[in-house]
């Protein structure tokens, strides 16, 4: 397998609400898509929003979850100040901050917000990480 991530697909409870969050709160550019799915191009990786029940059916698993989905998504920025600024912007637009920006044990600066379906996004600055 080539080391490449093509899509991150989030099973959402309300496609219209989730699409609005990612477009208006995070400012992601939406790609023209069919009505049952929304795509956002994030460089070489695409973010897909798909109804949770349909995604579960496609994967052959039950749609009911236990709460924490078992993963987080991360967005790295170029400075600690950018972490705090982005979290402030998300909060100002109605996003829910889960953890304010704070110094991390590994030497960077990190915080978390949740989208309307509870998916956790880490916003991080890592001085050791060249791919920001």
Predicted regions and their residues:
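Core segments of cupin and vicinal oxygen chelate
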Residues: 9-56
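N-terminal beta-strand motif that seeds the catalytic metal site of vicinal oxygen chelate
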Residues: 1-17, 70-75, 127-132
């Amino acid at each position: 397998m080539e080391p490449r991530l093509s899509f991150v697909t989030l099973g959402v409870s309300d496609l219209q609400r989730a699409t609005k969050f990612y477009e208006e709160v995070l400012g992601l550019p939406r790609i023209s898509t069919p009505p049952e799915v929304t795509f956002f191009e994030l460089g070489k990786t695409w973010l897909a929003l798909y109804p949770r029940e349909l995604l579960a059916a496609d994967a052959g698993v039950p749609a009911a979850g236990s709460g924490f989905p078992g993963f987080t998504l991360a967005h790295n920025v170029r400075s600690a100040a950018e972490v705090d600024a982005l979290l402030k912007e998300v909060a100002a637009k109605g996003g829910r901050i889960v953890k304010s920006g704070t110094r991390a044990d590994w030497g960077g600066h990190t915080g978390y917000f949740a989208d309307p379906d509870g998916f956790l996004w880490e916003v991080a600055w890592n001085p050791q990480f060249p791919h920001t």
